[in-house]
């Protein structure tokens, strides 16, 4: 092989090695999400800091909300698939921390950890489970999906809700873009909220930033015997930190047990807000 051919050959080899290395790096996803038919139509997703889910039509009989459930993560490692597998195949509840994190945040029929808040006549309205889902974009660093709700009851009027949520690598906050349609002549305030549990702990309001912040102990509903004890024999699972930001919010306050950041809204407009959470036990690898 002459010198020129040798150089060309080496160039091709190095190029292939470089492409292989780039490919290996590119396929390491930092965000993820999917429809979860094996768990009553959940729609779950995660970024590097936390995992989330919203409830689907198969859960309607249990009166769920259009709120957001929160799963705590111990590291940036993706956990959604492993949590569901552990729960539904291995019989190991995700309400217990086996080292990767846990689900200890109760939503019920509330806005949960960053769900939509609609305020009309000083009353908070919470919707039910979604009717349809669509994945709009899925890459290792960006996940975008849309949920549609056919009947959000507000002050005796039925509205339709579409919410598009974006999770991006390196961003602790999810982006939510909401459009409400239907017929309602009264004033509406719309934005994001955090449900404050009975054991209301520490919260802060940054009115000028349109931001609310809340934290509480991470307590699972499993019995103490099922929990992982720390070295003091305590069932404490650390602290949960949650925040919502609605740009240009006109109200940042507590309403019906929710810490809210909402603004004036006209039907048909797109309203954008941000929500996120993390755990005191989260550590970057």
Give residue spans per PLM region.
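C-terminal motif of bacterial Sec signal peptides marking the signal peptidase cleavage site
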Residues: 20-21
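Beta-strand-rich recognition/accessory modules
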Residues: 32, 238-285
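N-terminal secretory signal peptides that target proteins for export/translocation
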Residues: 1-6
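Extended, loop-rich substrate-binding clefts of extracytoplasmic carbohydrate-active enzymes
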Residues: 94-168
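Solvent-exposed N-terminal domain segments of exported/luminal and surface proteins
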Residues: 26-124
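A recognition module on extended beta-rich or small alphabeta surfaces enriched in W/G with H and D/E
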Residues: 74-78, 205-251
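Acidic (Asp/Glu-rich), glycine- and aromatic
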Residues: 161, 172-205
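Sec-dependent signal peptide recognition
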Residues: 7-13
